[in-house]
Amino acid sequence: MNDGFGDKRKKKMKNEKIYLYLDDTRTPKEGNWEVVRGYDEFVAHIRLNGLENYEVISLDHDLGESAMEEYYNNAKPNFEINYKNIVEKTGMDCARWLVAESMTKEIPLPQIYVHSANPIGSANIIGYINNYLKNQRLPTGCVSVKIPHTITVKQFYD
């Protein structure tokens, strides 16, 4: 199957649990993380392997230039995110998809981490996941983490 995702979507053996890292620019330095760069690749990876085969999923919020611009131009100074200004799907869209997938397939979510540098985006994802877990009468455990990673810096100027 040649759909542009290359080797990143290799199906794991049934007994191997997957650690998935969603980030458009950074790559974890340590661990056995599989890296996906955007929403479509994220969804395809989970559909291929099955949600039940994931141990941990770590989400970034800002997955493209318009998301970063919204963070620097609006979220950072005004403490809010206007999702209408963001063209690309974000980590929040991935969180919504995960919850829908969990509900539809009746599969519990794996441990969800958020490693985004955007504190408002992180809080939105964490709140969404933990509210879902609480509604399902499950322990809340979605947390913000720092995972050592390669550094790719993007600067945006007015």
Question: Can you name each region flagged by the protein language model?
Answer:
Residues N2-D158:
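Catalytic phosphate/metal-binding cores of nucleic-acid and nucleotide-processing enzymes, i.e., regions
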